[in-house]
Design a protein with these regions (language model features):
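Aromatic/acidic polysaccharide-binding cleft in carbohydrate-active enzymes
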Residues: 1-39
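Structural beta-strand/beta-sheet cores of well-ordered domains, especially the beta-sheet scaffolds
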Residues: 2, 9, 32, 52, ...
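Carbohydrate-binding surface patches
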Residues: 4-7, 12, 48-86
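Membrane-interfacial catalytic/cofactor-binding modules of polytopic membrane enzymes
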Residues: 24, 30-63
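Hydrophobic, well-ordered secondary-structure elements that form the walls
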Residues: 65, 92, 115
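Extended, solvent-exposed regions of the mature portions of secreted/cell-surface glycoproteins
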Residues: 77, 93, 106-108
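Solvent-exposed beta-hairpin/edge-strand motifs
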Residues: 82-98
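C-terminal beta-strand-rich structural cap/linker in extracellular carbohydrate-active enzymes
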Residues: 102-123
Length: 123
């Protein structure tokens, strides 16, 4: 769902909604991620520096960044704020949890679970 939001694509569930797990339903009903997907700036995101694991998407009032871990184990992923054309004073929010994600020395760094995507917003 994170990449759907980064691509500003329609959010379509092609499963029986009456039998989905509570976790799946919670994911599909995430107000923050739906708002990101339906942001007024409808341009799709793009990879940062041709890195297929880190994407950036302009929003009407900010920016979204996704970090995707394709590995089979958790790993820390980071991106320089200058690569995102953002000032060092930028602070992020995790779109799934609503928690603040600090930046350090011009970098944003997060632990990403195996085969998962962290979705951050700023602005």
């Amino acid at each position: 769902m994170a990449m759907w939001a980064m691509l500003a694509a329609p959010l379509i569930a092609s499963c029986d909604l009456t039998t989905m797990s509570p976790d799946t339903l919670r994911t599909l009903r995430s107000a923050a991620v739906i708002a990101l997907d339906q942001d007024a700036d409808v341009r799709a995101g793009r990879p940062v520096d041709d890195n297929p694991e880190i994407w950036q998407r302009g929003l009407r009032h900010g920016v979204a960044v996704s970090l995707t871990n394709r590995d089979s184990h958790p790993r820390t992923m980071a991106v320089r704020l200058s690569d995102l054309d953002l000032p060092e004073s930028t602070t992020f929010t995790d779109a799934w949890s609503g928690r603040a994600v600090p930046t350090t020395d011009g970098w944003v760094s997060v632990l990403v679970a195996a085969h998962d995507t962290v979705l951050l917003t700023a602005g």
